[in-house]
Amino acid sequence: MKCPFCTHPDTRVADSRLMEERNAVRRRRHCPNCGKRFGTLETAELKMPAVIGPDKKRSPFNAQRLRNDLTAAARKSALTPEQIDETVRLTEHRLYTSGQRDIPSAALADMVLKELLRQDTEAAVRFAALHKRFDNPADFASWLAQAVKTGGKA
């Protein structure tokens, strides 16, 4: 790593410590050229995959839009705002750690539905009606029967 004081291209690591709470590594470095010490904080760079819509357009993942859609689906259901926030956080975490560059909107909807089915079937049905592509009412009925049959484990 380049020294921030003298721009010497090579520095030595004097000490490394794992920072558990931040998932980071703190390193104390020493420059052999100027003799100064400095610290660095290293974290993994996780990128959020882009969402590929039905029209094949790429757009950034929008957590607020997901939160709004979940809130609309949860109207008159037992799903609490805290559960909605947790579902959004869990979805973001899964997207970050997926390692994918892009995710189809249908796969994103399935990911959210899987979590919703564990929490509240009514909200999951409303969410599915908005975000899954059903060719006809029979497809929706088939999906609903499968979701009920598996008891939210679909």
Curated annotation (Swiss-Prot):
It comes from Neisseria meningitidis serogroup A / serotype 4A (strain DSM 15465 / Z2491). The gene is nrdR. Binds 1 zinc ion. Its cofactor is Zn(2+). GO terms for biological process: negative regulation of DNA-templated transcription. Belongs to the NrdR family. HAMAP family: NrdR. Keywords: ATP-binding, DNA-binding, Metal-binding, Nucleotide-binding, Repressor, Transcription, Transcription regulation, Zinc, Zinc-finger. This is Transcriptional repressor NrdR. Negatively regulates transcription of bacterial ribonucleotide reductase nrd genes and operons by binding to NrdR-boxes. PROSITE patterns: ATP_CONE (PS51161). The keyword GTP-binding does not apply. Residues 49-139 form the ATP-cone domain. GO terms for molecular function: ATP binding; DNA binding; zinc ion binding. A zinc finger (unnamed) spans 3-34. InterPro entries: ATP-cone_dom, NrdR-like_N, RNR_NrdR-like.
